[in-house]
Amino acid sequence: MVERSQHLQDVFLKTVRKQEISLTIFLVNGVKLTGIVTSFDNFCILLRRDGHAQLVYKHAISTIMPGQPIKIFEGEGCE
């Protein structure tokens, strides 16, 4: 069970990192990035694609879409 004190973005990013799920990230300027999260902190996400790393600042992100359905919470109801 996920502690309620954790931020949803941290739970989401931790899940896709552990499961190595490919993401599509849209930036506020319209740029589309794809890759796998290798690390993240309060300010940025490290994205890997084709052996190259990209450091993406969270304030530049508009939308993150996983490449497949993910299960974040046990029971998977509306949280």
Curated annotation (Swiss-Prot):
One Pfam family here: Hfq
Q: Where is the Sm domain?
A: 10-70
Disulfide pattern: none
**SUPFAM superfamilies referenced in this protein's UniProt entry, alphabetically:** Sm-like ribonucleoproteins
Q: Which InterPro entries match?
A: Hfq (IPR005001), LSM_dom_sf (IPR010920), Sm (IPR047575)
GO molecular function terms attached to this record = RNA binding
Provide the GO biological process annotations. Answer: regulation of DNA-templated transcription; regulation of RNA stability; regulation of translation, ncRNA-mediated
Keywords attached to this entry = RNA-binding, Stress response
- What's any one GO cellular component for it? cytosol
Question: So what does this one do?
Answer: RNA chaperone that binds small regulatory RNA (sRNAs) and mRNAs to facilitate mRNA translational regulation in response to envelope stress, environmental stress and changes in metabolite concentrations. Also binds with high specificity to tRNAs.
- Subunit structure of this chain's protein: Homohexamer.
Family note: Belongs to the Hfq family.
Name the record gives this protein? RNA-binding protein Hfq
Q: Lineage in the entry?
A: Bacteria, Pseudomonadati, Pseudomonadota, Alphaproteobacteria, Hyphomicrobiales
